[in-house]
Amino acid sequence: MDKTYSPEAIEKALYKKWESHHYFQPRGEGKRFCIMLPPPNVTGSLHMGHGFQHTIMDALTRYHRMLGDKTLWQPGTDHAGISTQLVVERQLEAQGVSRKELTREQFLDKVWQWKEESGNTITQQMRRLGASVDWSRERFTMDEGLSAAVQKVFVQLYEEGLIYRGTRLVNWDPKLGTAVSDLEVLSEEEDGFLWHIRYPVVDSEEFLIVATTRPETLLGDCAVAVHPDDSRFRHLIGKQVHLPLCDRTIPVIADDYVDKEFGSGCVKITPAHDFNDHEVGKRHQLPQINILTKKGTINKNAPLKYQGMDRFLAREQIIKDLEQEGLLAKTEPHKLKVPRGEKSNVIIEPLLTDQWYVKTKPLAEPAIAAVKKGDIRFIPETWDKTYFQWMDNIEDWCISRQLWWGHRIPAWYDNHGNIYVGYSENDVRFKHKIDQSTPLKQDEDVLDTWFSSALWPFSTLGWPERTPELEQFYPTSVLVTGFDIIFFWVARMIMMGLKFTGKIPFKEVFITGLIRDSEGHKMSKSKGNVLDPLDIVDGIELDSLIAKRTSNLMLNSVRDRITKATRKEFPEGISAYGTDALRFTYCSLASTGRNVRFDLGRVEGYRNFCNKLWNAARYVLLNTDEEQIDFGDGAFQYSPADQWILSRLQNTVSKVHHYFETYRFDLLANTLYEFVWHEYCDWYLELSKPILQDDQALSAMKRGTRRTLIHVLDQILKLLHPLMPFITEEIWQKTTKFTSENGISIMLSTYPKVNEEFINPSIEEELDWLKSAIQSLRTIRSEMSISPAKLIPLYIRNITPELKERIAKYEKILKTLSKIDKINYLAPDEKVPVSATAVLGEIELLIPMADLIDKEAELSRLNKELAKLNKDIELAQGKLNNPKFTDKAPEEIIAKEKDKLAQAQLAKDKLLQHKNRIESL
């Protein structure tokens, strides 16, 4: 083995070998296990959330594969309607070509061309993270087979009356010219204004003051609402008010929707341009006056003066006109949530349009029942409340999008506006007996991307055909996804799965938290805190990282802020940590919380863990050979240390299985880390040395220790493999010659099982006592600054016959690992020189201090340390007592300063205790 572990030297070659040998394909006849990869956008590149979830899915896949289950991790990508269309449009614009200059067919040819050339970035990146998906089964949501499934579902739902065309309010993106889903609308707080407008009461001197953040929508107002219990306005309910700037009157209505305490207590109701107002309008049978075109300009339903104006220019003009007519009472600054299109960044308009809808209530009822009955289980279970909350209040699903890229809606229209739905124009003509002389035109719209995604678990397995894969792997075992798409994707898969297969799509749903930065902030391009998983794997220089984080940013101020923050956080850029360290970090963070704070310091810690494992393997391989181990019938004897580590191994194996079954990857990672680092490396490898280095030791005992070293290493590699596939495969390939298992890959070997024969509580208790004794003696050395190499005498007081026997049994180990030259037992009243003492149960361990340390030199060193700490404490206290600092500094900076002070005070207390001990010598 090389002296140091270099991930870059092994990872790509190992993955290539795994993939080319088809190790990822289902094999055997064991229990079926199947995971569906949530299909990433074909335009996308791997982000931290992908890396996190893919690691968890891969860990589960590798675990079940090693259990002997017939395992399938089904990969594929999503056509990502809007995202892909925008990417290709921008590419064409760079060449001076507008989409509108092309026919639909020409544009779609360009999209398919782009998909073939550039659409596989994310799948290549998945390979770098070790994803063991069955690439031979890779699917795409626009594949021929998946498109056939989409058509069948649409046609069947339409024929059953569950798909219809209707006029409703949708999120409209004026820049993209399409309806968008709630998930594609980002609402963040922005600075705006609240305009207070006077609405004069008809035939009265009174007026109502209405506060609004969107005065341009006043043109579509259909009522002013007040709370029914608001005594200020009760006398006006049912009266009419003049609509400012418009030649019409509107009623005053009473509705519980109004918040009496907000603004003036009066609310303008615009049913065609606000989702809440739309509901109020339905309750009061108000008209719906749409005042906007699909491009976001004022239409012909508004007064002539404003027609054709952009909505925001109209806003400015309306404010001026209101002022001129004395109808603007006041304007005040106001913070508000502004809905913007995720892709376009323009303000989204609620707009009345004709769209296609799925009637969801009949589909939702069995989907709710499936979770209530426990057929589908959410992990953590608290997420089922979110699921029920959404499903109980479900509204019809708008499934049409005004795009060219996507599954085109299989509906045709004749010249009279009649709608015909079928698999093709010929199918429609045949079914409805329409001859060729009647022209038919296909609907221009495409289906919402989530429509095809909702069929993913069964369409990828060959549905509507009854394929062997569908029979074997559906329902799938578990879905791993984020809480943000429980409704948009998870719920819809459950509804569609039950409707079209009669079965649930998956048995369990493991909901992960969302990856945030180390301060707990959401990762976003505008914040400049985004990390690319592959930059952590391969490393990146500072200048390249800054260039990556600031590309395509319009504002210089934002670019400068991000540059400054990046230089501060990563002055040397990011080191190359390798895939395994990153994957182990992801698993260690997979707790049950909503948010996951990602800290690069943890990756560094787990890179050290990789090094520790590598060095442990080198030690084992340097101290073993085939003859010395002899897994055949050669005589061997296990030492107490061997028995201890074998017993501890069974405990670890048991916990690991439990944590895999309960999806506690954080506890799983911690259990393996503790066992490998602390029990195997720190203790067992040290405990093996006195035996292997003792010329007097029995050859059978040495053989037993070597056998244990290699066996436990083999089990560790297998236990770790689902989390850290590369380093474990590389080391395992070097150990197979020493074991009876000469497999071709660790991923196809058998996952460790508990061996009851090795469980030995009494030996664990003895070794725990021995470790405590050694640790106590090492602590004395450290606290008293005694050289680790210096042999020292040990005195023991209050010894019992049982403990004396135990010490005799472990004397060689105790002396070797504690650097003790002689053990002396004291009579009850026997005096010893001034000593450092450790208490271990009933006994006292004493180390005489005479001649072991230079008292004056040590006191001088301690005084210097204390002076430095006093200075640090004074500095921190000064800051924290200064109102200029505590009032203005961010909370996290103040918290860091408090932590710094607490650490310094703790260190000072320890040094003072040590100084007192030295002075007493």
UniProtKB/Swiss-Prot annotation:
ATP binds at K525. GO terms for cellular component: cytosol. Residues 849-921 form a coiled coil. It comes from the Bacteria. A motif ('HIGH' region) lies at residues 40-50. The keyword ATP-binding applies. GO terms for biological process: valyl-tRNA aminoacylation. It catalyses: tRNA(Val) + L-valine + ATP = L-valyl-tRNA(Val) + AMP + diphosphate. Its main location: cytoplasm. A motif ('KMSKS' region) lies at residues 522-526. The keyword Ligase applies. Its EC number is 6.1.1.9. Monomer. Catalyzes the attachment of valine to tRNA(Val). As ValRS can inadvertently accommodate and process structurally similar amino acids such as threonine, to avoid such errors, it has a 'posttransfer' editing activity that hydrolyzes mischarged Thr-tRNA(Val) in a tRNA-dependent manner. NCBIfam families: PRK05729.1 (NF004349), valS (TIGR00422). ValRS has two distinct active sites: one for aminoacylation and one for editing. The misactivated threonine is translocated from the active site to the editing site. The C-terminal coiled-coil domain is crucial for aminoacylation activity. Belongs to the class-I aminoacyl-tRNA synthetase family. ValS type 1 subfamily. This is Valine--tRNA ligase. It comes from Legionella pneumophila (strain Lens). The lineage of its organism: Bacteria, Pseudomonadati, Pseudomonadota, Gammaproteobacteria, Legionellales.
